[in-house]
Amino acid sequence: MTFDENVKRLVQYGIESGLVPEEERIYTTNQLLELFGEEEYTEPETEFKDVDLEEVLEELLDYAVEKGVLKENSVVYRDLFDTKIMNCLVPRPAQVIGTFKELYKESPVKATDYYYKLSQDTNYIRRYRIKKDIRWKVPSQYGDIDISINLSKPEKDPKAIAAAKLAKQSGYPKCLLCRQNEGYAGRVNHPARQNHRIIPITVNGTQWGFQRSEERRVG
């Protein structure tokens, strides 16, 4: 498909998944055009439904490589850039927190279900990779234990490994799970987190951040 078609498809995905309100269709389109360095856009007449996120992101990434927007065509750099793409669709942290709190008043289950779905819809939890994991349950005296073999994390390519070794070491964010990761653009030796949202919670008078793991665990 053409670039314009893929932009329309992605924005439609955002609307269908609830990430983007209809009122922000044009705004989101323009955010994507800026990201790709495009100044012109002709909205396709075709209407899209049930958009496959993995497919449209792959095509947009290929376009970014062809245009020179994405300098290296490897999984590390593609992951960094597709996270930047998704950031154009993801609600701001305050909006996510507000929705979570409102749903929590109705039911903690509703709130956590909303947050889990959001983490997948934003591509923070990559559904198409998680499917590769092997999972099974083992009974124990404490209840069933979930065991998994993580096959969803792709292997880094040699160029990315070499670049990571040469990259300047940074103390920011302090770790992979710290609050400072929320919205962080990432670098070759630290994953992008622009599509990540953290829910502040208080436990025994201490402030914590509730978040989902990329591997679907709760942290």
Show the residue positions of the predicted features.
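Active-site microenvironments that recognize anionic phosphate/pyrophosphate groups
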Residues: M1-E214
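A short, hydrophobic C-terminal helix/tail in secreted or cell-surface proteins
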Residues: R216-V218
